[in-house]
């Protein structure tokens, strides 16, 4: 079971914070829209897309619901127990993102072993490992590849400009 929490709560808190203090709040439009906008999800089209990925595994209902929730809400925190297929959820979300947008994707994990595990999982799902770049100690930090898996420790000192190339960020192991 995946529990889907956060959709636009941070935006709503920020909006109230600014209103209470009479601060101006300006939303900057991007290709992905702003936090209050939602994507329409056609379950027929999404199912057709996901089935067409050629994965050797089928999404379980709770995984499909998490993918659908993430797409519809554009941002979310998905709470899921160990062994429930979080990497597979991330994989399906990133495949949808690649299909719909042309920006890089950053996946941030807490350890180098999880960088390697996520990379291996994507390969097991049928994804070309040459399309994914891994960043951690001792690895090259520059790449033209669209998907980057990294530890937060390897990138947190990077300049703001480095992050501007990313249209989508996934974090594994988020603690509230």
What do these predicted regions represent?
Residues 72-97:
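Walker A/P-loop
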Residues 97-104, 126-129:
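Post-Walker A helix-loop "phosphate-sensing" segment adjacent to the P-loop in P-loop NTPases
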Residues 112-136:
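Conserved helix-turn-beta segment of the N-terminal RecA-like "Helicase ATP-binding" lobe
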Residues 137-148:
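Conserved motor-coupling elements within RecA-like helicase/translocase cores
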Residues 33-79:
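Conserved pre-motif I regulatory segment
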Residues 152-154, 161-176:
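SF2 helicase catalytic motif II
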Residues 1-32:
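N-terminal accessory nucleic-acid engagement/regulatory domains that precede
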Residues 103-111:
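Conserved RecA-like ASCE P-loop NTPase motor core of nucleic-acid helicases/translocases
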